[in-house]
A protein has these predicted regions:
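Surface-exposed beta-loop interaction hotspot
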Residues: 1-2
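Catalytic cores of peptidoglycan-degrading enzymes
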Residues: 6-153
Length: 154
């Protein structure tokens, strides 16, 4: 579905890396399954690539969220938004403003939590930035069968 490389949803500093440990009472309890970007309340959050908005909602931990299905099994999620600017079913473009940085859900302050899944697997969303823009169409092309050459052709 996408036709260009993925971009970061914000250009700000990353404050928490994918896979970093989460401590509770001095003990490692979980791993961080996304990337956190610094942001002031109300700053813009952009779609990482073209796609269809699969879900817009409000959840206890994640707060206001937008999920975008980019096709090919790739879905990105944007958590803790102060405001969502898209609706489920909308087609969004790469770089389109989809929401505003917030502090909704269980957070210590305003920021964007960016997450990604490939099929049923949670992946580091920063890895999407290195996917060639032609990956999806190249995978489809590899499945095509070439027609045999006519005999006697030189």
């Amino acid at each position: 579905m996408w036709t260009a490389s993925f971009i970061r949803p914000r250009t700000s500093v990353i404050t928490s890396e994918f896979g970093s440990g989460r401590l509770f009472n001095g003990r490692l309890t979980t791993r961080h399954l996304g990337v956190d970007f610094r942001g002031a309340l109300g700053e813009q959050v952009r779609a990482a690539n073209r796609g269809v908005v699969a879900l817009v909602g409000n959840f206890f931990l994640a707060g206001n969220v937008v999920y975008i299905d980019h096709g090919g099994g790739v879905v990105t999620a944007y958590f803790h938004l102060s405001k969502t600017l898209v609706s489920a079913g909308d087609t969004v473009t790469r770089g389109q403003v989809i929401g505003l940085v917030g502090a909704t859900g269980r957070v210590t302050g305003p920021h964007l939590h960016w997450a990604a899944r490939y099929g049923a697997v949670t992946v580091n969303p920063l890895d999407l930035l290195s996917i060639d823009r032609n990956w999806y169409s190249a995978a489809a092309a590899r499945k095509q069968v070439r027609a045999p050459q006519a005999s006697g052709a030189r």
